[in-house]
Amino acid sequence: MATNGFRPEYEDLGRYEDILGQLPMLQVYSHIMLPFAMPEGLSQDTIIADLEAAVRQIRAHVPWMAGKVVNVGKGPDNSGRYIVVPCPPPDPLIVVRDVTHAFPPYKEIQRLKAPNSMLDSRLLAPTNAFPQRFEDSEEDPFRVIRLQASFVDGGVFLDFVTQHNMTDAGGLFGFARLVAMAMRGEQFSDSLLEQVNRDRRNIIPLLTPDEPMLDHSHHIRPPITDAQPVVRPDPARWHFLRFTAAKLAELKDLASQTMTPDPEVPYITTDDAVSAFCWKKYITVRHRRRNTPDARSRFSRAMDGRKVLGIPAEYMGDLVHNVTTWLTFRELVDLPLGEIARHMRRELNRANTAYHVRSFATFIAQEPDKSTIAYGGRFNPDTDVGSSSVLRVDLFPVFGKLGRPDFIRRPNFPGIPFPSLLYFFPQNPQGECDSLTCLTDADMEALNQDSEWTSMVEYIG
């Protein structure tokens, strides 16, 4: 059922304060960028008008997306609360830039498959990005949503940006899908608005006193002191990789054939197989340099808690928890792919539960100073891998007259690398999965010389 309005309670911005979004590490912006070829006869003015109309429709029906995020109550040993408050609309509603002078024609970008080296955030993004914190100000408010359209010869890049305390990856992609719906001339259904504007305050039932909390100590990061300063990793850069549909299927078949029977693991997924492959190869090339077979490596997978909590995919708040698998360097080098994938799936089956999400939320809720909590905790980029996969998410909808995007990308923020991070983006209509990873030059050079790696992975750059 379509609607032109919404319930009055949606305007109560207090309903959008949740628990998992209270981490100071989320005081950042998340970006997803979609490049499009300009259809014949479609003007820039028409695209801009359609985008602005879409943003107006979203602001009118999703009040929290029209606001900004502020931190209140912060003090000694207390990280405060992140809440959304009203904010005047930006003028103009979206950022528009003509960057034709700085880019080759879009057909050339298509031919090169939009490598990361071409995607300069100084030109294509309206603001900074994770892991760089954003500070709210009168001149530049910490808006919940931002959108930039950057025009090149024959194409346009749309950069969708959301505030991370208010949305996880599901919410970021949800913002892009709302824009696509509005550009197709669709109204937002009552059921969609119910989830997008859902009351977040009690969406995760905390543990009761008689329910034991699980161990989440690995999410505590060490304090930064003179005695224990921040360790600066080797220089690292972001790279795009591609797994074709055939290679994804080949990896899954290989993993399935080399996995020993396990009653806890009735099956493994494509996600398990490709994650295990990357983990194995990353550590293999590092082991050749380090020769530390007994060193422990951690693979941390960000998991969407919606399904286990019975919450629809359209819900846009933070519902991420992490599942961790530990193996030694020796195991990762020597074990067949299927055994590594089996270990990962077993840990996921054990931890990807409603109880685990409730326990993690309780852990966060009980800690006044949440600045010590991080998804990666004591993350060591030389031994560990942090991963987020949305391989199965559909993010190639039709954006009205613009049609479907050609790629899913993220602007390149070269000054803020995060070594050993790995994103798997949604598969395109051809079944190809593009991956964004941040690796040291030594790691990337070694991988590109590894025949097993290059037989499975196309390097885009």
From Swiss-Prot:
Keyword Acyltransferase present in the record's keywords: the answer is yes
List the InterPro entries hit by this protein, alphabetically.
Answer: CAT-like_dom_sf (IPR023213), Sec_Metabolite_Acyltrans (IPR051283), Tri101-like_N (IPR054710)
Assigned keywords, A-Z: Acyltransferase, Transferase
Describe which pathway this protein belongs to, using the record's wording.
Secondary metabolite biosynthesis
Q: Name one Pfam family in it.
A: TRI-like_N
Question: Which EC number(s) does UniProt give?
Answer: 2.3.1.-
Q: Which Gene3D superfamilies match?
A: Chloramphenicol acetyltransferase-like domain (3.30.559.10)
Q: Give a yes or no for keyword Transferase in this entry.
A: yes
Q: Which GO molecular function terms does the record list? A: acyltransferase activity
Q: What induces it?
A: Expression is under the control of the azaphilone cluster-specific transcription factor azaR.
Tell me the protein family, please.
Belongs to the trichothecene 3-O-acetyltransferase family.
The task this protein performs is described as: O-acetyltransferase; part of the gene cluster that mediates the biosynthesis of azaphilones, a class of fungal metabolites characterized by a highly oxygenated pyrano-quinone bicyclic core and exhibiting a broad range of bioactivities. In the first step, the non-reducing polyketide synthase azaA forms the hexaketide precursor from successive condensations of five malonyl-CoA units, presumably with a simple acetyl-CoA starter unit.
Name of this protein: O-acetyltransferase azaD
Which source organism?
Aspergillus niger (strain ATCC 1015 / CBS 113.46 / FGSC A1144 / LSHB Ac4 / NCTC 3858a / NRRL 328 / USDA 3528.7)
Q: What is the lineage of its organism?
A: Eukaryota, Fungi, Dikarya, Ascomycota, Pezizomycotina
